[in-house]
Amino acid sequence: MEDPDPGGDEAFDTWRALQKATDTPRADLLSDIAGHPEGAPSVEELAYLNPDKSEDAIRRHLRRLVDTQVVRVLEVAPGNRRRDFPSKFYTITDEAQALFNQNGLFPREAWQRQYTAVEKTARIRDVEQMPRPRAD
């Protein structure tokens, strides 16, 4: 499955962003993104934190968040990828973060405490410690 181009030309639509972000399954994912130590988890990490959701369902929700410019994809360049490790990570866009801050949604500090409290497998700890590409 191909992820949509996160660099679309459409203007950020505040109402649509809030509508998509506050849908419960997507809000759960955004909370996990906000709480991640790097602010950019992979689908594998999100699936671990949301065992009731399949990776396909998570990808579908992320695609909607990317389409509304709430989340953007950070992709490891082909020459820098590590075998058997994720190459795509998801982070909240600057526009969405400003909107969330203004409305008291997804406060990073609160979700980081929650994220830290989750017991993780060795594999998830390894993935969590991977370097992430930086947003441009």
Regions found by a protein language model. Name each.
Residues 95-136:
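Amphipathic alpha-helical dimerization/coiled-coil segments
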Residues 33-37:
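Short helix-to-turn junction characteristic of helix-turn-helix DNA-binding domains
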Residues 59-63:
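Short, hydrophobic-biased segments on the C-terminal half of alpha helices
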Residues 18-25, 76-102:
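Short, cationic-aromatic polyanion-contact patches
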Residues 2-31:
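Short alpha-helical segments that sit at the start of domains
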Residues 53-54, 58:
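Short coil turns linking two alpha-helices in DNA-binding domains
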Residues 66-78:
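A short, conserved structural fragment
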Residues 38-49:
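Short acidic, hydrophobic short linear motifs in intrinsically disordered regions
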